[in-house]
Amino acid sequence: VLVSELLGSFGDNELSPECLDGAQRILKPDGVSIPRAYTSYLAPVTAAKLWNDAKARGDLKHMETPYVVKLHRHALVAEPREAFTFKHPNRSRVIDNTRYAKLAFARGEQTKAATVHGFAGYFDATLYDGPAGEVRCSIYPPTHTLGPGGEKMFSWFPIYFPLRAPVDVPAEADVEAHCWRCVGQGKVWYEWAVTAPVVGPVHNVNGRSYWVGL
């Protein structure tokens, strides 16, 4: 059994895939990993204070860096959508931890106009399959893990991916975005972009503003 506590607010943002891929060589062929799998989610978010705090730093870097934050004055513009999934142990002959997701956020009829300041990120992890079913750990809003008193688990805050410029979304209009998990020589980074209702720039190209070292 390989037990780890490497999950970040976006699931894989603290290099859990790379660390576990390296450690799984000590597992027997029938060995198991805890966690067994995790999926990240993104949702467009209205969060003027977060955006202004990043903008006040006065440079591109701070508008292309994801932040782990406790979301207070915010509103999700659409329901979260699935981004990336990782499973362990990974028995693939060639392991590739790059990922790409095209995310379509349907808002539906009678939704009001909104301003998107970035994206809120979450994760949902399956720790293991127990006698009574799957044991999970999650900050994804629909499945957020609850404590014994019914309170939401407080161990992880969401992650916030800012946009360089806010995007105004008309009433009933949908949002489309793209997100990449990139792996390069000695580093891992994310890139993200909005392509509807307007086409915006790709953020953090080649990890120029933010990356995590391997």
Describe these PLM feature segments.
Residues 1-180, 184-214:
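Class I SAM-binding transferase module
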